[in-house]
Amino acid sequence: MSTFITFEGPEGAGKTSVIKKVSERLAKEYDIVTTREPGGVLTSEEIRRIVLDGDSIDIRTEAMLFAASRREHLVEKIIPSLQAGKIVLCDRYIDSSLAYQGYARGIGIKEVKLLNEFAINGLYPDLTIYLDVDAEIGRQRILKNNREQNRLDKEEKAFHEKVIEGYQKVISDNPHRFIKVNANHSLDKVVEETYQSIIKYLK
């Protein structure tokens, strides 16, 4: 029963924590693989380091690096896992590029979509969970979090607001595969709603 489920949302939405807890519950019934973008495999993790931890990068270079990382991740991990009948839970995928580089960076959603369609070669998610959090709440969570902030975390509030606008545009263009979860709530509540949404989809 191979299924490709992605998780999207702005910085501070809690994707990593939600995926961890949801995957633990799903693993009691299903064969689950969890992964992330950028990253997931060695080559993609190296690209992640360059893009997120390096100095300022040209916005088109940034978009192309994310697409290259995505291609390697697909070929090395996502596609083999799906072919083996597993359920793949992925922290970010093509919609992140559309919202961040396409809309917030101003390259254009259409242009970034074309670039990424070459990379994914038709492999869109079966289901995408969008963790919907207010920009200010997300920003405060980042500041309170002990993890080291990356280059995108450090962007101004206006950038993160544009990311959210970009996601809304992407969702309105693809309503058939998105489920919105209010991520302003407590982690436990978000996890429960996300888990129930996925179970309903799978059954």
UniProtKB/Swiss-Prot annotation:
The keyword Kinase appears for this protein: yes
EC supergroup of this enzyme: transferase
Keyword ATP-binding: yes
Binding-site positions, ATP: 9-16
UniProt cross-references to SUPFAM superfamilies, sorted A to Z: P-loop containing nucleoside triphosphate hydrolases
Keywords carried by this UniProt record: ATP-binding, Kinase, Nucleotide biosynthesis, Nucleotide-binding, Transferase
Catalytic activity as recorded in UniProt: dTMP + ATP = dTDP + ADP
Enzyme Commission designation: 2.7.4.9
Pfam family, one: Thymidylate_kin
GO molecular function terms attached to this record: ATP binding; dTMP kinase activity
Gene Ontology cellular component annotations, sorted alphabetically: cytosol
Family annotation (CDD domains): TMPK (cd01672)
Protein's GO biological process: dTDP biosynthetic process; dTTP biosynthetic process; dUDP biosynthetic process
Functional description taken from the UniProt entry: Phosphorylation of dTMP to form dTDP in both de novo and salvage pathways of dTTP synthesis.
PANTHER family associated with the record: THYMIDYLATE KINASE, UMP-CMP KINASE 2, MITOCHONDRIAL
Family: Belongs to the thymidylate kinase family.
Name the UniProt record assigns to this protein: Thymidylate kinase
Encoding gene per record: tmk
